[in-house]
């Protein structure tokens, strides 16, 4: 599509859309204009219509979806309803929310080459575009890999590379970094921002993780109930913080901290927050972690790579560092509900993903697993769920070996939710999905479990809906509900907060905290891990490199760096201020207490100094008593009024 003169790239007027089989419109009178070169962040509660809006830009809606469509959408001056998808697709690159919906080639190279091949380019130019696109997303070394062997985050990178190889005028991305580690997220967003600035590619990006996106976007658009309810420049968006709170959106920690303290400012980083709080320019100092329980043995002072089997005392507990391949070879702990010994596992015999894992998990623990994309987190969960056969070593659950051949005996006791919920949904309604697990129970018990699980995931009002018609976040909660209904003793979750807004994340994780016996979950969201896990495992290259309490592991910068993780902003701020806090609530409580203590000490010191100050001393100082009395500071006796 040849670029038209003028700067309006997307113009939407009074857009209404209703999916086939539904009576309630998903989009309700949307009006939106985006100019050439803008970077627009589109956010809103789960199920508000964000993904649907993106699909209208390249003609998937209404050309492929059907349904009832009205209104006008112009892309670079071209009316989408009157254009064919081939023409639209050359102008609009769409990255889907679920990478598995987009990837169809068996190799990374073929997937990225598909677009340029359809433009009938010569082989040399295609190779050049593939190489450059993979380099931009950090996947050049995976060019010949099978797409089936990639992690979720790596698949997202490949989908982005496929679009970059086409160099569209508009790049529309639906939660493109939701499965990436923090470092990978920044790398991809920096690449996208560079293309946006240098080539004036227009960006429309849907995301819930505002703390990672706000600093890249020029403009923030919020949807709710199929309508746009806020459209502001990034610099002014949090002037309307009540809208974010009302809709259950996650506000970046520095912004939330300032507003909680009554400071009208919207810093997007720890450094900016400290400047607002009067701590000056702290770009370097804020990165220095401190251990306030035992300063002599701070984990943050470690500069050497973690050695195998090394224990570091952190004052309030022990954290183990290293790959732990050779320890704990004896009998498993009697309290362990899960016991792993020297586990080697992978998808190809000559390419192991897990490399000598040893792990004990006790009943009642909530264990978060973090690490870089491809580090083995999902593979570890698949072994715990008996969906992968170990190449070497053993996995024991409830004291018995768990392997694919006898996994049926654990089916009702271990519940597993895939990273991609669509792999689990096959019924005609949400209600049927929740009923499927306990279908052999008595009718009354089935009813009770179904209702309880749907309520726990806040989808009771969607019970008659077709799962495939829901948003990704709603589909994920449906998959979780289908597992909760069998009432398992162990729940395994792979990225359970993907596609969820703040309210649904808190509701889900609080339910697990209060009702689940044992929980093991993978996540890239370090804030969630810190708040809801009793124990944090960090993985890198198929090995566990740290294992301990989250508030202790988080202080080790070297470990975090090795696993492509970063400290949450509130922890960075607390470190600089000399406060041991991992949440806004903790930090505010400490700062408030310190402020009160300072005021009390100042008052007591002033009282003492005033009472000790005699009239003669006042006279000697050249200050007249009557003048002090007139000032209201002290009375004629030299005592503070």
Swiss-Prot record:
Top-rank taxon: Archaea
Gene3D superfamilies in alphabetical order: P-loop containing nucleotide triphosphate hydrolases
Keyword hit for Metal-binding: no
EC number from the UniProt entry: 7.-.-.-
GO biological process: transmembrane transport
InterPro entries: AAA+_ATPase, ABC_transporter-like_ATP-bd, ABC_transporter-like_CS, ABC_transpr_CbiO/EcfA_su, ECF_ABC_transporter_ATP-bd, P-loop_NTPase
GO molecular function: ATP binding; ATP hydrolysis activity; transmembrane transporter activity
Top EC class for this record: translocase
KW Acetylation (keyword) present: no
A Gene Ontology term for the protein's cellular component: plasma membrane
Topology in the lipid bilayer: Peripheral membrane protein
Domain ABC transporter: 10-250, 338-566
Location in the cell: Cell membrane
Binding site for ATP 1: 44-51
Compositional bias ranges of the Basic and acidic residues kind: 298-310, 322-332
Keywords annotated in UniProt: ATP-binding, Cell membrane, Membrane, Nucleotide-binding, Repeat, Translocase, Transport
Renumbered residue ranges of the record's region Disordered: 286-332
Sites where the protein binds ATP 2: 371-378
Function: Probably part of an ABC transporter complex. Responsible for energy coupling to the transport system.
NCBIfam families: PRK13648.1
Family: Belongs to the ABC transporter superfamily.
Official protein name in the record: Putative ABC transporter ATP-binding protein MA_0870
Organism: Methanosarcina acetivorans (strain ATCC 35395 / DSM 2834 / JCM 12185 / C2A)
